């Protein structure tokens, strides 16, 4: 690439770059220099790692950061996923802030009390905050004492189920947590009622003991804690992205229950997808889980069913209704223990539809025994807009205003008033049968063999639901542990749990295509089987860039994965406009050259086609590949102010800083006072020897002043005693200014002891533009010697021409009007010395000639020169 000046005079005013080796002394740099090699091709961006990089927080500003840009488009450059290596509790090559850390406080190798910590770039996120339904008191909490919760910046709740959200009031009101909490609108709407019901049913909301003790008898949190936590919770819409202190997260549909969502999280270039509990199968009222448009680096996925396979939903509904119909036919009762929200609404939709299709069942009562569900049914009626198309269409129809306005379902307000006479179906909470209405009905109906209990959800280890699957002959009373009840009631498991099975989970992992998978929310055995199955599936990728690694950490076990994120900078403001103009010119030249090449190829192809037609041959050649037209390397150097905040890097000109960052700026000016024993003419000679030209802007009896390279000011106070009292001033706005000032100061300090000074001061000299010297062995004047070679335009053109001659030899032919041609074979390059332009159909030759001319401009120019050169 060749710099395009506006005029011939301007062309030769371009000073050559300053190299550090040319300065006699360099000061320590207080600024960070970063060099980014950025390259954009038509397919993707390949970016090399910076030679030096550092994460800057709180909008620290680094001046004079240099970016070597090979291609820049649309004002910014993107990159692909960061490269990574991983260890498990081992030291690795990455700094601590470059390590992604996963720490499970609960829900690892178990189902229940889901709570996970992820940490990267000093940002901490907690994913879910549940309680274990099979445990009580503090034992049901995640292991909060194993991690400093005050470090958590954001807490994301995936859905309202107890094992994912029940410890949230405790975290928000009774711990040192100070972060922000987010969940979807529907989840928050249900959260309040669910938590209050949970406190009541599990009896953990009793009044505190007088001494404030924390034993099993004291409450873990109160209704007041729930209400206060409720007010602090913030909401997020599906498909909306929020950014908090450099953490970006987006919510996507997860299926499972109303309001359930996945979170796609981005921190400093690292992408993490947390599925929560999710279902890839659309049911009667919810969407299936979505596949996010971006691919994550790390997937944190549930593994509830491990390698198990679930039956098709149609078959599950057929089995459910068949068992219910058969039990009613023989005069029995059917108990369906469910979670109050989610699975319950799905079953009620199935039963209401089945009853409407079977007249012989319409005299049999179907009851829903849950005060909580009745309260929350209004939420379901409100949020039909986020349900699937079937529900939304049903809601909008005139025949039935709301699909949750059931015709054949009745609610039980008080179990003591329930008239248990004849066959019936009761959908009751809780789903694990630990307490409440479902447990009372189980104990009441258990001795009768005509009755049936159908377990429709996932059964957690240690609960009565899990115990029933073992078909015990006796069950323990919930109110009196010493009393046992004979169990003759039939037991069926027909899982409507809205979780993924192995096939669905495996297909989802394949679609999102992560390089790392962390399995959570699953018992040890099924989770271990799932890990083995996934590793076996991706065994062929081992050792390649597409390798997939799978982890199943235990609770309180830290997983460390090293990610070296790449620094990406956006060029903004006037700096971007300048670069875009340069790039447009380069792209135009590139396209023009490529079009010429395509034209030549087309002409050759047409000639070849004519020959083939004459010979009766068919054309089997392929068309030129146009994908390479846009490949571009510029080598353009861009300088500006680098602003870093929340992992975003912006490169700006100083004057644009306030507009784009709202940062205020200050100018720092440095002064250095020194004294030397020499006259001004000798000082000027030494400075010109180094810099070629100094601009004297004031020369009177009181003061002398000059400017060097428009950066460093040198003042001399002539009113002070013998010697020169010098003040050197410069603005600390970049590394070059500091280095240039150091060089000037070093030259001034060396004048007194320089051998050249001694020699020059011992002879008669005229320290003007030329210097008069004598031979060492004679007092006669020999000839004037210039500080530098001639810098006029004609002389520099001659030296550039000599450089081209040395490069291309006899292939170079000089033409009148300061032009030349270079002919190599059939390829000709036209050179215009005045405009510093090269015209050539061959990109290779054109680039070579332009590089020689560019180097010649640099070599023939001093560091600084008189703007009035002839």
Swiss-Prot record:
Compositional bias segments (type: Acidic residues): 601-612
Single Gene Ontology MF annotation: metal ion binding
Binding site for Zn(2+) 1: 159, 161, 256, 277
Localisation per UniProt entry: Nucleus
The entry's keywords: Endonuclease, Hydrolase, Metal-binding, mRNA processing, Nuclease, Nucleus, Zinc
Record GO biological process: mRNA processing; response to xenobiotic stimulus; sno(s)RNA 3'-end processing; snoRNA splicing; termination of RNA polymerase II transcription
Positions with biased composition (Polar residues): 618-627
EC top class, as a word: hydrolase
Entry annotation: catalytic residues: 499 (proton donor)
Record GO cellular component, one term: mRNA cleavage and polyadenylation specificity factor complex
Region (Disordered): 598-627
Main location: nucleus
E.C. number(s) listed in UniProt: 3.1.27.-
UniProt-annotated binding residues for Zn(2+) 2: 163-164, 277, 521
Function: Component of the cleavage factor I (CF I) involved in pre-mRNA 3'-end processing.
Stated family: Belongs to the metallo-beta-lactamase superfamily. RNA-metabolizing metallo-beta-lactamase-like family. CPSF2/YSH1 subfamily.
Protein name: Endoribonuclease YSH1
């Amino acid at each position: 690439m060749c710099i395009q000046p506006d005029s011939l005079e301007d062309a030769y005013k371009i000073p050559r770059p300053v190299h550090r080796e040319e300065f006699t002394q360099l000061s320590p740099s207080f600024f960070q220099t970063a060099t980014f090699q950025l390259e954009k091709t038509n397919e993707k961006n390949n970016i090399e790692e910076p030679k030096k990089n550092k994460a800057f927080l709180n909008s620290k500003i680094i001046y004079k950061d240099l970016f070597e840009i090979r291609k820049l488009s649309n004002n910014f450059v993107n990159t692909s996923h960061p490269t990574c290596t991983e260890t498990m509790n081992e030291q690795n090559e990455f700094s601590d802030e470059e390590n992604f850390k996963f720490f499970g406080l609960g829900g690892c190798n178990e189902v229940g009390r889901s709570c996970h910590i992820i940490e990267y770039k000093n940002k901490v996120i907690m994913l879910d905050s549940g309680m274990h339904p099979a445990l009580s008191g503090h034992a049901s909490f995640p292991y909060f004492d194993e991690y400093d919760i005050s470090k958590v910046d954001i807490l994301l709740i995936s859905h309202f189920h107890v094992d994912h959200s029940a410890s949230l009031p405790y975290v928000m009101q009774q711990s040192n947590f100070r972060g922000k909490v987010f969940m979807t609108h529907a989840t928050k709407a249900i959260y309040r009622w669910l938590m209050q019901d949970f406190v009541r049913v599990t009896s953990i909301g009793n009044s505190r003991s007088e001494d404030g003790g924390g034993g099993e008898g004291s409450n873990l949190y109160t209704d007041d804690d729930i209400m206060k936590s409720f007010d602090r919770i913030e909401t997020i819409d599906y498909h909306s992205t929020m950014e908090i202190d450099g953490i970006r997260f987006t919510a996507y549909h997860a299926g499972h229950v109303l309001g359930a969502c996945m979170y796609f999280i981005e921190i400093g270039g690292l992408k993490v997808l947390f599925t929560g509990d999710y279902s890839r199968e659309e049911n009667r009222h919810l969407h299936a889980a979505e596949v996010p448009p971006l691919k994550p680096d790390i997937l944190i996925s549930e593994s509830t069913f491990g390698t198990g396979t679930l039956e098709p939903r149609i078959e599950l509904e057929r089995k459910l209704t068949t068992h219910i119909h058969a039990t009613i036919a023989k005069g029995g009762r059917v108990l369906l223990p469910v979670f109050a929200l989610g699975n319950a609404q799905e079953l009620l939709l199935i039963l209401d539809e089945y009853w409407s299709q079977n007249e012989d069942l319409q005299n049999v009562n179907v009851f829903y025994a849950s005060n909580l569900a009745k309260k929350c049914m209004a939420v379901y009626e409100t949020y039909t807009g986020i349900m699937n198309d079937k529900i939304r269409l049903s809601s909008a129809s005139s025949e039935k205003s709301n699909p949750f306005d059931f015709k054949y379902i009745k609610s039980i307000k008080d179990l003591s008033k329930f008239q248990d006479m004849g066959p019936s179906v009761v959908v009751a909470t809780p789903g694990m049968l630990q307490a409440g209405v479902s447990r009372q009905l189980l104990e009441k109906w258990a001795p009768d063999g005509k009755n049936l209990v159908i377990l429709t959800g996932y059964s957690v280890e240690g609960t009565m639901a899990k115990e029933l699957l073992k078909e015990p002959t006796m069950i323990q009373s919930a109110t009196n542990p010493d009393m046992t009840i004979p169990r003759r009631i039939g037991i069926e498991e027909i899982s409507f749990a809205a979780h993924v099975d192995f096939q669905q989970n495996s297909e989802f992992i394949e679609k999102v295509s992560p390089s790392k998978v962390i399995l959570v929310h699953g018992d040890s055995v099924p989770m271990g089987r799932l890990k083995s199955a996934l590793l076996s599936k991706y065994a062929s990728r081992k050792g390649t860039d597409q390798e997939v690694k799978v982890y199943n950490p235990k609770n309180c076990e830290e997983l460390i994965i090293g990610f070296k994120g790449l620094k990406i900078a956006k060029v903004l403001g006037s700096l971007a406009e300048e670069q875009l103009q340069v790039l447009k010119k380069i792209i135009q030249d590139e396209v023009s050259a490529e079009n010429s090449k395509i034209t030549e190829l087309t002409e050759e192809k047409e000639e070849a086609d004519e020959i083939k037609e004459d010979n009766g041959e068919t054309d089997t050649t392929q068309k030129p590949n146009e994908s390479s037209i846009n490949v571009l390397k510029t080598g353009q150097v861009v300088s500006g102010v680098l602003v870093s905040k929340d992992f975003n890097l912006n490169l700006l000109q100083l004057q644009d800083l306030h507009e784009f960052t709202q940062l205020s700026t200050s100018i720092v000016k440095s002064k250095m006072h020194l004294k030397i024993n020499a006259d001004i003419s000798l000082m000027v000679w030494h400075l010109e020897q180094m810099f070629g030209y100094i601009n004297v802007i004031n020369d009177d009896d009181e003061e002398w002043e000059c400017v060097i390279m428009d950066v460093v000011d040198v003042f001399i106070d002539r009113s002070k005693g013998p010697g020169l009292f010098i003040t050197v001033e410069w603005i600390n706005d970049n590394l070059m200014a500091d280095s240039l000032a150091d060089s000037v100061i070093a030259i001034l300090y060396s004048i007194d002891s320089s051998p050249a000074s001694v020699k020059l001061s011992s002879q008669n000299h005229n320290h003007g533009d030329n210097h008069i010297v004598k031979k060492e062995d004679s007092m006669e004047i020999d000839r004037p010697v210039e500080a530098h070679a001639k810098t006029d335009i004609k002389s520099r053109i001659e030296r550039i021409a000599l450089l081209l001659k040395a490069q291309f030899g006899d292939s170079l032919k000089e033409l009148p009007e300061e032009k030349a041609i270079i002919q190599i074979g059939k390829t000709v390059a036209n050179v215009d010395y005045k405009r510093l332009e090269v015209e050539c159909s061959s990109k290779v030759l054109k680039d070579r000639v332009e590089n020689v001319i560019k180097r010649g401009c640099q070599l023939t120019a001093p560091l600084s020169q008189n703007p009035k050169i002839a």
